[in-house]
């Protein structure tokens, strides 16, 4: 809590102070020192992220599909349940220190921005936003409100990334002239057009909340969960899903800046799906 309130300078100091000096004998953290955290989008990746936050107070959880998120709600019986993040913010944001966002890509920016505008720190799953422009807006919000932020790019913290960077920087593999990066994505259904007919919205689903800023369309089970990644209105395709993992080591290791040229190709181009 002190770290979030005092910024990076205080954090550096706290990092080298033993727990006993801070009054946390044997590593025990008083309840008053724990962070109050809200989770938005908890059924998929959000569930794993929350597992890493178990040491803190998970006070509120929001999922647009309560059936998909039921196993997570059961993990945190003390957390209040919502199916619309706006209602959770209205009721609980004032009591929160930070918000975890792991919804479909197209709602990352608005959910994070609303929390940041209220002065709350955020952890947002990758891809950070649906568009580059949204990412720039969040950067401005973070600077304006002096917030701690993090994107969920777990691979960037792996030992393998640090090792390959050291190899490159130490010249152990010689001059790098070409890098090939590949992925098993997309592993969702491909080459789809929008369904001609919609389906009845499940009783456990808040479809309007899932759509968020996306254009209105009838509910269909092909959109969510998981497969939203393959629909442009909701996801960012294979590039948005995996480039942060497989290209980050390349950019870090070779210390690359913005690209000078990008070329893309596909055997099939569709307006609806990736």
Give residue ranges: language-model regions.
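NAD(P)-dependent dehydrogenases' Rossmann-like dinucleotide-binding region
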Residues: 41, 172-190, 202-220, 260-270
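N-terminal Rossmann-fold NAD(P) dinucleotide-binding loop
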Residues: 46-47, 108
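C-terminal segment of N-terminal export signals and the immediately downstream linker at the start
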Residues: 16-45, 51-53
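Rossmann-like dinucleotide-binding domain that binds NAD(P)(H)
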Residues: 208-274
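NAD(P)-binding Rossmann-fold cofactor-contacting core
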Residues: 58-75
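Beta-strand-loop-alpha-helix segment that lines the small-molecule cofactor/substrate pocket
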Residues: 104-105, 109-157, 171
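N-terminal secretory signal peptides and thylakoid transit peptides that target proteins
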Residues: 1-11
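Basic phosphate/pyrophosphate-binding loop/patch that engages nucleotide-derived ligands
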Residues: 140-147, 165-177, 198-201
